[in-house]
Structure formats: C-alpha cells, structure tokens
C-alpha cells in the first residue's frame, strides 16, 4: 500500500507539472513583449508626417524601437525604423 501511495504522488506531481501554464521568467520578458503574437494584437498608428506606420504601445516603446509621435496622454506610437 505504501508503494502504491508513492506511485500515486509521483503521478500527481507529473500531471500538475506537465499541465500547468507556462511561467514567464524575467529573461523571457523581452521575448514575450516582442513576440509575433503580441505584435499582431497591437493597434497601428501614424507617425509624425504620416509617411510611416507605427505601433501603439501602452507602456512606452520596447528596446530598439523609437517614439515616432508625441501627444498621447497615455502610451506612445513607436516604430522600428524612425530615427535611424
């Protein structure tokens, strides 16, 4: 009976470990922030001058992106091209 309990506990732990949601670690954060899935969900915006499309980011521009339009109360219109 004791060994059956150990097997049941191991199976339960494996089940929980394999089925739980993914934990985003700090070193993953940039990957998650810039993932194709996240970018596809973002709203497009027009940069100053209207010649370029940007992407609206609520918490500011990610690394290697540039703020291409000012005047938003909250968030920024950012582009990877502008300012280079």
UniProtKB/Swiss-Prot annotation:
GO molecular function, one term: toxin activity
Domain of life: Eukaryota
Disulfide bonds: 45-77, 47-68, 61-78
Tissues where the protein occurs: Expressed in ectodermal gland cells. In adult female tissues, highly transcribed in mesenteries (gametes-producing tissue) and slightly transcribed in tentacles, pharynx and physa.
N-terminal signal peptide: 1-21
Keyword Disulfide bond: yes
Keywords assigned by UniProt, alphabetized: Disulfide bond, Neurotoxin, Signal, Toxin
Miscellaneous note of the record: Negative results: does not show activity on all ion channel tested at 10 uM (hNav1.1/SCN1A, rNav1.2/SCN2A, rNav1.3/SCN3A, rNav1.4/SCN4A, hNav1.5/SCN5A, mNav1.6/SCN8A, rNav1.8/SCN10A, BgNav1, Shaker IR, rKv1.1/KCNA1, rKv1.2/KCNA2, hKv1.3/KCNA3, rKv1.4/KCNA4, rKv1.5/KCNA5, rKv1.6/KCNA6, rKv2.1/KCNB1, hKv3.1/KCNC1, rKv4.3/KCND3, hKv7.2/KCNQ2, hKv7.3/KCNQ3, hKv10.1/KCNH1/EAG1, hKv11.1/KCNH2/ERG1).
Biological function: Has toxic effects on zebrafish larvae. It causes contractile paralysis and twitching of the tail within 20 minutes, followed by death within 30 minutes. Does not show any toxicity when injected into arthropods (cherry shrimps or grass shrimps).
Name this protein carries in UniProt: N.vectensis toxin 5
Organism whose genome encodes this protein: Nematostella vectensis (Starlet sea anemone)
């Amino acid at each position: 009976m004791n060994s059956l309990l150990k097997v049941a506990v191991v199976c339960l732990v494996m089940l929980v470990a394999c089925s739980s949601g993914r934990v985003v670690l700090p070193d993953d954060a940039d990957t998650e922030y810039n993932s194709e899935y996240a970018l596809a969900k973002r709203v497009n915006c027009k940069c100053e001058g209207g010649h370029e499309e940007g992407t609206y980011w609520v918490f500011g521009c990610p690394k290697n992106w540039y703020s291409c339009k000012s005047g938003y109360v909250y968030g920024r219109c950012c582009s990877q091209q502008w300012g280079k």
